Curated annotation (Swiss-Prot):
GO terms for biological process: killing of cells of another organism. One of its GO terms (cellular component) is host cell plasma membrane. Homomultimer. Pfam families: Phage_r1t_holin (PF16945). It comes from Lactococcus phage r1t (Bacteriophage r1t). This is Holin. It is found in: Host cell inner membrane.
C-alpha cells in the first residue's frame, strides 16, 4: 500500500507541474501577464483528476497506482 501512495503522489506532483506550465504558457507573455489564480485552479483540478485516476486504476493487491501490470513474467 505504501508503494501505491508513493506512485500516486509522484503522478499528482508531475501532473500539477505539467498543468501549471501549460496554463502559464497558454496566454501570458510575461510573469506580470499571468493570471496566477486561474493557473493554480487549472493545475489543482488536473491534480485532483490525477489522484482520482490513480484511485480508480489501483488494483487491490497490486500495490501500484498503475492500471498496467509492470511486473515482469516470473516475478
Amino acid at each position: 500500500m505504501k508503494t501505491f501512495f508513493k506512485d500516486m503522489a509522484e503522478r499528482a506532483i508531475k501532473t500539477f507541474a505539467q498543468a501549471m506550465i501549460g496554463a502559464l504558457g497558454a496566454g501570458a507573455t510575461g510573469l506580470i501577464g499571468v493570471d496566477w489564480l486561474q493557473a493554480l485552479s487549472i493545475a489543482g483540478f488536473a491534480t485532483v483528476v490525477s489522484i482520482l485516476t490513480s484511485l480508480a486504476s489501483g488494483i487491490p493487491g497490486d500495490n501500484t497506482a498503475s492500471l498496467v501490470n509492470n511486473k515482469k513474467e516470473g516475478e
